[in-house]
Amino acid sequence: MKKIGFFIALSILMQACGSSKSLVTADKSIIKVKLDLVTVLEDKVLVEVDPGAFSANEVLFFIPKTVPGTYSTDNYGKYIENFKAFDYKGAELSVSKKDDNTWVITNGASLDKVSYYVNDTYDSESEVESAVFSPSGTNILKDRNFMLNLHGFVGYFKGLTEVPYELSILHPANLKATTSLKETNSKKVAGLDVFYASRYFEVTDNPILYAKADVASFEVNGITVNLSVYSPNGLYKASALKDRMFKMMSAQKTFLGDVNSTKEYNILLYLSELENDASGFGALEHHTSTVVVLPEQMDQVRLEQALVDVVSHEFFHIVTPLSVHSEEIQYFDFNDPKMSKHLWMYEGTTEYFANLFQIQQGLISEEEFYERIMGKMLNAKRYDDTMSFTVMSENILDDPYKDNYGNVYEKGTLINMALDITLRDLSEGEKSVLWLLKELSKKYGDAIPFKDDALIGEIVSMTYPEIADFFAANVVGTTPIDYNDYLSKVGLELGTVEEQSGYFLKGDVPFIDVDQANNNAVFVRENIELNSFFVAIGLKGGDVFKSIDGTEITLESLRPIIGQSFGWPTDKLVTIVVMRNGEELTLTGKAGIPVVKVDKIKSKDNVTDAQLQLRQVWMKG
């Protein structure tokens, strides 16, 4: 009876202050969020966030500065407009904006809810200096499509990231949601979805794609995979892409073996029209889904291969960092993040697996695998090869480290290749990077983080003293990796060979380019290896074509010349007029048979049986 009397008295007191909401304090109350995707005003969506009761006079509300998996400062608060806070009577409270992502609400004890409008990122990517990477961005296209990366729509109150969220989304009845969030409204109401998240991280970890229903589902070793496709011009259907995804993900599960994984996985594929649309192509991983953005204009063969390469990388993130990760990720601070030292693992291991599984499962040939690894070596040269990978990782949001982020996919892969070969060599083929991640996953899993500074020591204790030397020199330290040392263990080596090319391109790689800022002038590309035809005739990087065999060169006139060149006889005399440093030059020479020098990974001449055996277990498992 005393408790009842106490709550009655407190209720009367709160009502006298104008309160009409539950007296549950904010830290014990579910946060209720409403998104209105029907009444879209000027390409903006209205969001309301309704917490429990506060006692503090000052309340802080945040929209994320950055989110896990992006490793960049994106300031999603810049896309928030008309932010307001209301008391229990509906009157506005005083609000000040502290920075791009923080709002300070005074008289917090009277706070009922906040509301604001969200602008999307896709159609403004070309207008801003540092655009949000499209797979982590947002799209608002009234009645047609909504890409809800929820960190761009839903914010959080200081100290309340661990309380549950209920998301009520009013949407056009003709659009269907694809997401891994669980619905709570057992009795469906047309045009209304209600989702539950156990904490704020779960909100940000579960994007939602609203589009006209185009979903293909399939089962892979106990996982239900849903492929949802938004193709604005109807060029692609989920059903047409399903088979390749099934084959790829089946191979991934076979490669992973008994690693614990999700029961459901959603692939949200957004195909961009390019103009005033998403232009950052790739994907962003989540525990049970991934957002993929690719151009709709790609032909199906290239689109499917891009999906294989991108989605396989994202799916492998279920191993790391979604399972094996540090405290910095488990307790991620969305507005003052402390970054982990181990991007060599989170992104490097994942990208390595995304290539290794394809050779192990027979999706690509050995030659294709070597070409991919060689490509990583060449691409890694664009970055600082003496930069400590762990120092770069923990400072990845800052200069000069952030400009080297792309190297996590290049040298990060190569670090894992060298580590993998070393483990195979020291264990007579028994241990590998995959074995290592499985062991770490058994110990930690998604609920138990490791201590950032202890990981390398733990890996050494699980393996061999030589692994400590490797990390000290090549991951923590600044010593570049001698890749030949590791390739030689499996009977391979780096070398240069001559390969036949076309006169103007090798495969899909052209030796020429177009300067759109200079009337589409056609010029010789710089800083690439030119073929023997270009070299022999005297062409140099930066030369601007004026004519070929008397034909004035424009982008339009060059296309048929390239087509005709495939039939040129070797003794044909070719005359090319170019502009070089303001001077017109006439260059003449025979067509010949064009070849280009190519860096390759190739088999050594005197390979031992032991090296072949180690190569077999490395590449075939």
Where are these regions (language model features)?
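An active-site-proximal "capping" alpha-helix that borders the catalytic cofactor pocket
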Residues: 83, 252, 345-357, 576
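Juxtacatalytic substrate-recognition/specificity segment
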Residues: 49, 214-342
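C-terminal recognition in membrane/secretory proteostasis and scaffolding
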Residues: 354-355, 363-621
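C-terminal motif of bacterial Sec signal peptides marking the signal peptidase cleavage site
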Residues: 15-16
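N-terminal, post-signal-peptide region of Sec/Tat-exported proteins
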Residues: 52-88
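Non-catalytic architectural context of zinc metalloproteases
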Residues: 73-82, 86-262, 281-282
